């Protein structure tokens, strides 16, 4: 059984203008991560779980919807999933 650890910012991010459907998907995502860990998240194609690059190297991302992402890291030796951020992904380039 994996543990889920949320950064203190996550509560503030979720309390904002996050749609209820995204909150439900995030709770389901946490249930899957808690029970089966990163392998379970990768097995469900709807999450489109993937490694991140550049400044987020070492982190992973799962889709909660077309726009929303949960960004997290895995600490395998402690069976821990650290949620860093739940955010509306911005596709605009600077």
Model feature map: region roles:
Residues 1-66, 74-94:
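Basic, Lys/Arg-enriched alpha-helical interface segments
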